């Protein structure tokens, strides 16, 4: 009986493994990021943000794309924000969510900050992941890609001035019952750095962080994961707080730390395309696709 069950599990997984056997292209993800950065700064109310939103609409024009527009109360007054949700249906009853934020820092609106690693790289990552999902009904859970608006603080980071898009969507999905269907929420942030070193996030769900590390080991990428840990406040938090098993896949150490850049290139005009690496995006993409497979096997 045990042998039969094992064989059945293997046979059930074969279509999923075969369907995702095509190699993830970090080069394609980087090209998507380049096109996204070409929109310019993407802060609320900017032409660059409108360009970025139109870019996402164009990329997902033939997919099941939903715009989630709402008005957020911010320290500078009401602001209209828009999340994007792209649904790829699966045969199993449940949802895996892969997410990123796509806008840039509002307080840096008078600088040349374009968030190449902070928003654009992860947008490129999800766009390339979409190429591995579309065109068929997935054999496992449905996979939803979410692009959050309003992750950044409008004035100064606090519980009420940050994570606007994720707080809104988590609350909305709690009311309509979507949260109960989520088997895993995987957030991507700052993962295009040439010197990739993903941090273990202690504010995430330990079991899902463990699953991501297992995916890194299975894909031969463990050397880039979890050498250190940090208690990050990020778009996973509103979901963790509502009981959704979640991971935050983030490289918090970005660029040299010196007197001029105490936080490295994070939130500086130096966060530019030349700091990104197709190899790092390939590593991240492989781990995300393997994490989907592992979640489906659970």
List the model feature ranges, each with a label.
Residues 63, 92-96, 139-144, 180-184, ...:
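Loop/turn elements at helix/coil->beta-strand transitions in domains of secreted/extracellular proteins
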